[in-house]
Amino acid sequence: MRKTFDVIVVGGGHAGCEAAAASARLGAETALLTHRFATVGAMSCNPAIGGLGKGHLVREIDALDGLMGRMADTGGIQFRVLNRRKGPAVRGPRAQIDRALYAAAMQAEIRATPHLSVIEGEADALVLKDDRIAGLKLADGREFSCRAVVITTGTFLRGIIHLGETSWPAGRINEAPAMGLSKSFEQIGFTLGRLKTGTPARLDGTTIDWAAVERQPGDDPAEPFSTLTEEITTPQVECGITRTTTATHAVIRENVHRSPLYSGQIQSIGPRYCPSIEDKIVRFGDRDSHQIFLEPEGLKDTTVYPNGISTSLPEEVQKAILTTIPGLERTRMIRPGYAIEYDHVDPRELEPTLETRRVPGLFLAGQINGTTGYEEAAAQGLVAGLNAARTAGGKEGVIFDRADGYLGVMIDDLTSRGVTEPYRMFTSRAEYRLTLRADNADQRLTWRGLALGVVGFARQAQFDAKMRALDAAKEAAKSLSLTPTEGIRHGLALNRDGQRRSAFELLAYPEIGWADVARIWPQLAEVTPDIAEHVEIDAKYDVYLARQAADVSAFRRDEALVLSGVDYADVPGLSNEARQKLQKAQPRTIGQAARIEAMTPAALGILTAYLRRRSRHRSDAKAG
């Protein structure tokens, strides 16, 4: 085993796998350090990938030739597009995943990746030289040299599991936590916080009364995550839906004092949008019931994940809860649910490249940055791995901004605003939703991945072919036109204004689809359904996209006003509160400063004027 690498990635979860693979795709000699290779690609909580906002991230990861989308297509056992009846901007692709198939596919991919080695062991301490990363020391005494390190420790940093009145150190059920790295971070000067997440019990699906619950099938045909997947070939399954009852709520209320969340045993904050069932009952006391999705964990695994009843109540209380839920009255509980607390670093310590400001060459990704969710972790991992490889090669880091994609929105939110609770991606967080759709992730990002060298030949060939087909279809739709009289003859409701309208312009009408224009111009029927859908979406959003492009231009102008080297004490007119906020956050640009909580327009105006004066003075000095 070699002792020197360009990049070492710590952790084999979703962030770690994407980081290691991205680094290796750029040609950096990369090591993935994990406790046990058998746990690489493990899905610690729910057996699903994607969803609202999250599905956008998976598509963006795929557009940059990441792994998650392809692995999900391999292991997916039910695919659904959420919000399908709404506009394309807020639709969310999602899939139930066979845990075993997903992990096996991920492990095979990691093993087959050139320039990527796997080391089994526990990271104990960061090794610095001249205040920058120089290597990593393991708990067993081994030491490896490198130019960059990516930390993706998930819930393992000083992790503690809570189950009723009992708690014990763990990073995941039956797995030891990582203790040394937290000490290393504190010694360097990082401020660590604590966050909490939880998971529900696991149930024996053979003991569920499936006749008593609603059945939920997937979409047919299934829509893959990856543009490289031609069709889903894995057998598909149904999920079940049931609900809590007033009897369920009574059991929880009688025992809520035994929950670590309410006994004072847990002090840290959990995810707002994924609360435990006891939290739901306390916070939403007027609700008679809460929905539970019964999600199969695999084709050859009878385990079922009851999505919606995450809890850390004592095991016997969890069993009592199950007896009150329709379809689960006689269900055998395989494993109780639990909560887990873990360390995280304030993400405002990071540059938008995910490199730490304190230690050059040190990158963080995933739950260590205060996020929750596989997709959020994976997207950060890809960006961190990409930039770690560039740093190791002596190149500048790459920034994805809020107009580039949801991954840019997330990273900007984290590095500008920090977190007070686990951060989850939603479509509502993005200002440019019409532009940042799940269906056009490759059009937005693959060209950039090609320029960076992170996209391989197979995706390049597929992308080039798709763009040629898309351009040809759009050109054809714009070149074919008719008069209002001709349109009315074809059954279209058009104004008799004498204006010719192209097929592309007709597609902007809400009631006109590709099938309608293809009936008028039969040559359009030759366009494949996926390309036709892209053109139709572009046509329907055309006017709005033009307006949003102007907004993006204004945003980019603000992002171009760089604040590096500004001493806020020297900026006249700033209030003390604004100075303190700016000094603490250290925003990189005016745009980032604008996103600091409670930053006033007046303060931003003063800053902008100061920057312009400074720029003029520097220009005058150079001219002189």
From Swiss-Prot:
GO function term, MF aspect, one: flavin adenine dinucleotide binding
Binding site for FAD: 11-16
Keywords, in A-Z order: Cytoplasm, FAD, Flavoprotein, NAD, tRNA processing
Presence of keyword Ion transport: no
NCBIfam families xref list: mnmG_gidA (TIGR00136)
Keyword Flavoprotein recorded: yes
Subunit structure: Homodimer. Heterotetramer of two MnmE and two MnmG subunits.
Cellular component terms (Gene Ontology): cytosol
Positions of NAD(+) binding: 270-284
One example of a Gene Ontology biological process annotation: tRNA wobble uridine modification
HAMAP family: MnmG_GidA
Organism whose genome encodes this protein: Afipia carboxidovorans (strain ATCC 49405 / DSM 1227 / KCTC 32145 / OM5) (Oligotropha carboxidovorans)
Protein name per the record: tRNA uridine 5-carboxymethylaminomethyl modification enzyme MnmG
Cellular localisation: Cytoplasm
Cofactor annotation: FAD
Main location: cytoplasm
